[in-house]
Amino acid sequence: RHVCHLANATISAEKDHCPVCITFTTSICTGYCQTMDPVYKTALSSFKQNICTYKEIRYDTIKLPDCLPGTDPFFTYPVALSCYCDLCKMDYSDCTVESSEPDVCMKRRISI
């Protein structure tokens, strides 16, 4: 088991009206965070689950090839610069137990 840290991951980018899906590598946050669950729980007990999440991020942009005219061919994605354990921030994090793999493509796939 690894504590919260940066790791490379393959993700995918695709859009409507662009015929291909591009897979590429970026950095993500992954690993475990210590959580304490009280032995005695009451209705007033609060439970807070820490997750490994972004501390600092930047955004990079790639251009999807062969998009139809009038389609924005650019895809912007987060790049993790540092990670830490904190409460899940639903505005930019996937806090589900099981989500789809980050490199799922619905269209023809190419790698860069």
Curated annotation (Swiss-Prot):
Protein name: Lutropin subunit beta
Location(s), subcellular: Secreted
An MF annotation (GO) of this entry: hormone activity
Record note on quaternary structure: Heterodimer of a common alpha chain and a unique beta chain which confers biological specificity to thyrotropin, lutropin, follitropin and gonadotropin.
Cysteine disulfide partners in this protein: C4-C52, C18-C67, C21-C105, C29-C83, C33-C85, C88-C95
UniProt cross-references to CDD domains, sorted A to Z: GHB_like
Broad class of where this protein is predominantly found: secreted
GO terms classed as biological process: G protein-coupled receptor signaling pathway
Record-stated family: Belongs to the glycoprotein hormones subunit beta family.
Sites where a glycan is attached: N8
Keyword Glycoprotein tagged: yes
Entries under Gene3D superfamilies matching the protein: Cystine-knot cytokines (2.10.90.10)
GO cellular component labels: cytoplasm; extracellular space
Annotated source species: Aquarana catesbeiana
One Pfam family recorded for the sequence: Cys_knot
KW Secreted (keyword) present: yes
Alphabetical list of SMART domains matching this protein: GHB
Highest taxon, organism lineage: Eukaryota
InterPro entries, alphabetized: Cystine-knot_cytokine, Glyco_hormone_CN, Gonadotropin_bsu, Gonadotropin_bsu_CS
Keyword annotations: Disulfide bond, Glycoprotein, Hormone, Secreted
